[in-house]
Amino acid sequence: MKNFKLFLFLTTCLFFLNCHTITESKSNSNPDFKVGKAGFEKRLKRQFDFDKLSIGFYTTKKNGSSKENGLNLTFKINNLETISDSLINSYTDVIKEKVKANLLHLKDYNYINITFENELTKGNLRKVNSIKIKKQLN
């Protein structure tokens, strides 16, 4: 019985030590676009109105075996609360198609995280509302 408890304890420890997710983010590893970042931003501005676009990259390793590479796009939009959910969904479809058409090394990316943010600052108080949508690229 003592050996069984020891075996069970060690098995449980090994299980929980191996089941973890590590997310790495690098600010200097921006993805490349066929038309450059500024050109990509201009093409998106033709479709819909936003104040600022931030582009980033992330890598997630799950259980040490599978790896997920993704693209982060954050759009600063005024009056986000007035935009309907169906319009947000149509925006994400357009953004996904533009990314597929303009992203270099598309096969290296699995997902795109699209975030729409509205920031309101009053004195020391900063309030951020956001909508986050994850779409598969391939």
Spans of model-derived segments:
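Bacterial signal peptide processing site
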Residues: 20-23
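C-terminal motif of bacterial Sec signal peptides marking the signal peptidase cleavage site
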Residues: 15-18
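Polar/charged, Gly/Pro-rich intrinsically disordered segments
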Residues: 25-80, 104-138
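Bacterial N-terminal signal peptides that target proteins for export
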Residues: 1-8
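Short, non-transmembrane amphipathic alpha-helical segments
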Residues: 84-107
